[in-house]
Amino acid sequence: MGIRVINVKVRGGEAKPAPPLAPAIEKLGLDVNKVVEDINKATEKYKGFEVAVKLIVDENTKEYEIEVKPPTTTELLLKAVGASEPSGDPMHQKIGDLPFEKIVEIAILKKPSLNAKTLKAAVKTILGSARSIGITVDGKDPKQVTKEVEEGLYDAVLAKYEEEWEKA
């Protein structure tokens, strides 16, 4: 008896106490409904996305930990613009436009997997991804928006989200 790990993919906030999840949880002697409820709480902010969940169970104490791997930045950006795939020619063929605040929201969602220390740095990372798949921001090339972020033009917007960034 030791540590067991169960890896499973679920739709954010929509895990069900059914196969393949339920039998694996039952076999470890855990309350299936409670674990599924906890998984749904942990994945709620990724509603509409398929996310990888790692359930780490101590077989001796029956205590468990849930780790959620967020969707990729590309998946989040594509869903935000309603596109199914990136542009094959992002410099000339745009697939959509997003408001700057949506970029900030995606940066906050991605905080656990980004190496950015500040919200501003995280936003610049997401802007780079948006540019590489053919998305404009507020009708502008994300490279221009990145320059404007560096110049402080978006400081007021970023300040509104700072508390949310700290909690993420």
Swiss-Prot record:
GO cellular component, one term: large ribosomal subunit
SMART domains attached to this UniProt entry: RL11
Claim: Transferase is one of the keywords in the record: no
Family matches, as Gene3D superfamilies: Ribosomal protein L11, C-terminal domain, Ribosomal protein L11/L12, N-terminal domain
A GO biological process held by the record: translation
Keywords for this protein: Ribonucleoprotein, Ribosomal protein, RNA-binding, rRNA-binding
Pfam families found in the cross-reference section: Ribosomal_L11, Ribosomal_L11_N
Keyword Endoplasmic reticulum recorded: no
GO molecular function list: large ribosomal subunit rRNA binding; structural constituent of ribosome
Quaternary structure annotation from Swiss-Prot or TrEMBL: Part of the ribosomal stalk of the 50S ribosomal subunit. Interacts with L10 and the large rRNA to form the base of the stalk. L10 forms an elongated spine to which L12 dimers bind in a sequential fashion forming a multimeric L10(L12)X complex.
Family: Belongs to the universal ribosomal protein uL11 family.
Function as written in the Swiss-Prot or TrEMBL entry: Forms part of the ribosomal stalk which helps the ribosome interact with GTP-bound translation factors.
PANTHER family: 60S RIBOSOMAL PROTEIN L12, LARGE RIBOSOMAL SUBUNIT PROTEIN UL11M
Protein name per its UniProtKB record: Large ribosomal subunit protein uL11
